[in-house]
Amino acid sequence: MSILRNTPPAALAWSVWGLGAGLFLLGFFHRVAPAVLHRELSVDFGLNATSLGSLSALYFYSYVAMQIPTGLIADRVGPRRLLIGGIIISTLGAILFALAPSLFWAGLGRFLIGGSVAVGFVCTLKLATHWLPTEQFSLAA
């Protein structure tokens, strides 16, 4: 016995999935950005290795802290809204980090980025379970 599911058109479903996957990919970029920019960050903010590591770690602190709340919030408000919010906040965090006049603002930007890209993976999987046919879930995951 098979259960029929009403899913949106494939192009729309994969487009929305791509949005979440794009945010997840952006998260990987932001994880390694301080390693690539270590010289520039050290010179611009006068950082030693410890301070640079702390600046980089702010991303991971907020990323980890948002993992469980992300699932709960996605169940309450829906993954699409949460994903859009994550994209907006990560964009604001990236702009703040790029234009930061001091270490405080750079750290706040990193913290916002980490917390907001944390929604990417959870929301993408949740959208895939609802929007894609069951046979295609393993491809989307």
Question: Where in this protein do the model-derived segments appear?
Answer:
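Helical-face signature of the major facilitator-like transporter fold
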Residues: 23-28, 60, 94, 102-114
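Residue-level signature of mid-helix packing/kink "hotspots" within the transmembrane helices
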Residues: 32, 60-68, 118
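Extracytoplasmic
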Residues: 15-49, 70
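Conserved MFS/SLC helix-loop-helix module at the cytosolic interface between two early adjacent transmembrane helices
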Residues: 65-104
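Cytoplasmic helix-loop-helix junction between adjacent transmembrane helices
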Residues: 109-141
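Helix-to-coil boundary motifs at intracellular loop junctions of multi-pass secondary transporters
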Residues: 44-45, 76, 127-131
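Juxtamembrane helix-start elements in MFS-like secondary transporters
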Residues: 48-56
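Small-residue-rich segments within alpha-helical transmembrane domains of MFS-like 12-TM solute carriers
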Residues: 28, 32, 98, 114-122
